[in-house]
Regions:
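Substrate-binding pocket helix/loop in short-chain dehydrogenase/reductase
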Residues: 20-21, 28-33, 132
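Active-site loop immediately N-terminal to the catalytic Tyr-X3-Lys motif
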Residues: 22, 69-75, 97-98, 139, ...
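Alpha-helical segment proximal to the catalytic Tyr-Lys
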Residues: 49, 93-97, 160
Length: 177
């Protein structure tokens, strides 16, 4: 109630651990679902009624290209982020008549503490980071500075007729071929 009237919501929570699927325990599943999916659901429940009452707004959910291309050792994370994509598209459709534009940004491998933390849980951290770099057609990890522009666009009036879209920002990782 103290935050005023929300016009933009950016859900950018993320948590991951490198773990081959056959070694994944239910506790890890529950932890990742809680942060990566349930956290977004909770934010939507808090913010959207106020946003709708104020005449609409913009929601940008940050998922991951791991949900779109798969990534060995990230089955639970990919499932969470794929769930966020499906949830987002459905909610975008439900809220389109309420002047709420809801879109998803899917980052590729990004040089952040999150990725470094994931790498540290792998048997060979540097080899994993190199594999991420090599998977990207631009042959580099994204930098945090690669994302504010698309987020700002989707939060702006220039995006008043953009909703339900999933936008990859990954140096071409999801290109066909």
């Amino acid at each position: 109630n103290d935050l005023g009237v929300p016009t933009v919501l950016v859900n950018n929570a993320g948590f991951d651990r490198f773990m081959p699927f056959l070694k994944t325990e239910p506790k890890l599943w529950d932890q990742l679902i809680a942060v990566n999916l349930t956290g977004a659901l909770n934010m939507h429940h808090v913010v959207l009624p106020k946003m709708i009452a104020a005449g609409g707004g913009k929601v940008i959910n940050v998922a991951s290209d791991a949900a779109r291309v798969g990534s060995s050792g990230e089955s639970v994370y990919a499932a969470c982020k794929a769930g966020l994509v499906g949830f987002s598209k459905t909610v975008a459709r439900e809220l389109a008549t309420k002047n709420v534009c809801l879109n998803v940004v899917c980052p590729g491998p990004t040089d952040t503490a999150l990725l470094k933390g994931v790498a540290e849980t792998a048997p060979n951290p540097e080899k994993l980071l190199e594999a991420f770099r090599n998977a990207v057609p631009m042959k580099r990890l994204a930098q945090p500075e690669d994302y504010p522009g698309i987020i700002a666009l989707l939060a702006s009036d220039d995006a008043n007729f953009i909703t339900g879209q999933v936008i990859s920002v990954s140096g071409g990782l999801t290109m066909a071929g």
